[in-house]
Structures are given as structure tokens and as C-alpha cells.
Amino acid sequence: MNAMDSQSTQINMEYQFTSDRNGITDKQRKDVSAILDVSARFKIFINDDLYFDQAEFPILEFYTYLYNWKKAIDQSKRAQEFHYYTLEFDEYEDGAILSIIPFGDSARLKSIWAEQELYHVFDLDYLIRAFLTLEKDLKRDIEAYFPIKLDKFIKHIPAVVFDWNR
């Protein structure tokens, strides 16, 4: 794939909460099982092709990974790999549920749960901006839908800790 093709690769991410609006409250911020039960239908389209589709995706846990990744980018002032794993699944020999793999000024999106194998190369800045926008939108929408403040939850939501590139 040449550079022109990578410039035209587009990503679209959609989510719809599947958990009850009152399924979690600020009082449950330390309840890991309640946190993991909060789910959404999460889809990723690459150039209008369905790439990733999970009906009961643990959205608070995923948000935590995005939040930690955003912090690592802010602190290091450079692009970082992103890898999402869930506590509910433990077979990762083939990789993470979702990964952003940067190389040069480009990046790939990879998933062990992909609906179909698509090998698309993205502009690195474009893909990072798309996932940082997703983090911001998720925070806004989670707090609007559920009666919680993520700032109170974030330190209690389990997540794998990575050694970020400095």
C-alpha cells in the first residue's frame, strides 16, 4: 500500500450503551464486577467495512485504557502503542483485543477479535486523533448516560500497566 492509500484510509467508531442507565453509581466505584458489567455495543469501521463488532463490550474498562494511553502521550509528548486487554478474557497469545501499532509516520489497527482481516495503514496522527476523540466522547457520553463521575472511578478500574515509550 502506498502513502496515498494510507492517507485515504478512514476509521469510524460507534458505540451504544447496552447496560441499564442506573446499572452503576458512584457508590460502586470500587466494585470491579459491577464496573466490568457496564457494557456497550462497540463497532469499528475501516473504509465502511465492519472491522470490529462486540455486543457486550466492557466500556468502562476500555475507557480506562484510552485514558491511561492519553496520559502517556501527554507526558511523553510522543506517539505510544495502544493495547487493550480485558480481565474477562485471558488468552492473548495472538495479541490484544485492540492495538494501535505505530511505525514511522503510519500506524496499523489490529484486533484478535476482528470481524475480518483488513490490512490498512493509517496516517499516525489521524489514527491517534481518532482514538483521542473517542476517549473524550466516551467520557462525556458515559457521564451523561450513567449517574457517575469517571474521575472518581478511574483509579479503581483494573487495567494492565504498560511501560510507555519516553
Region roles according to the model:
Residues 25-36, 73-74, 96-102:
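Short linear motifs in intrinsically disordered
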Residues 61-68, 109, 129-133:
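Short, surface-exposed linear segments at secondary-structure transitions and domain or protein termini
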Residues 2-64:
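N-terminal low-complexity, intrinsically disordered segments
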Residues 20-22, 89-90, 151:
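Short linear sequence elements within intrinsically disordered, low-complexity coil regions
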Residues 1-9, 159-166:
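N-terminal domain-onset segments
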Residues 55-94:
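Compact, well-ordered interaction domains used in eukaryotic information-processing assemblies
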Residues 112-166:
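Mixed-charge, glycine-accented linear interaction segment located at domain edges/termini
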Residues 80-126:
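An exposed acidic His-Trp-rich patch
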